Amino acid sequence: DVWAMDVARFGDYASPQYGTIKSSENYERRFIMTFPNETLPKGRKQKTTALYDRFINQGAVMGDSFGLENVLWFANNKEDAHEEPTIKRSRSHDYVAKEVQNVRENVGAIEVANFSKHEFIGPDARKFLDHVLAGKLPKPGRISLSPMLTYKGKLYGDLTVACLGENEFMIFGSGAAQEMHRRWFETNL
């Protein structure tokens, strides 16, 4: 697994200045425990979506993924929108439970700006994806999860496949792995 050495895991946001800021931040913390729910503040807000300010005003606690600020969970209000690093159950637990219950009983929406998106359209789209993905492709109007494997059968990507039409697919995956997945698709064309 050479993921840690793959420069494709960094996007355009990772300028030399960003590298210096994050390297310094990590070096300063070299003997400090990192908590599972902890996000580090330096080098943030490289990219935001059009909904960023609205989310903040609605009590969003933000994280960053591949340079993009994304919602982790929502507090009741802007003043409660903070996390406290812990190895125990974090303060997000009750808020997230409430979000989950609301989606189960009502309806919910998700912003997928931090997901990678790959579109495949054409008469051979299904045949190609059936070759590079290990899962069964969905029928039109359906979605499925499908792993993308290496030639040796190791997991290369965990993807969601939406079949928009008989020969039209939208594939979602990790935003941080977008370039890595794109290379794999192109290698197998």
Task: Indicate where each model-derived feature is located.
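Glycine/proline-enriched, intrinsically flexible loops and inter-domain linkers
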Residues: 2-189
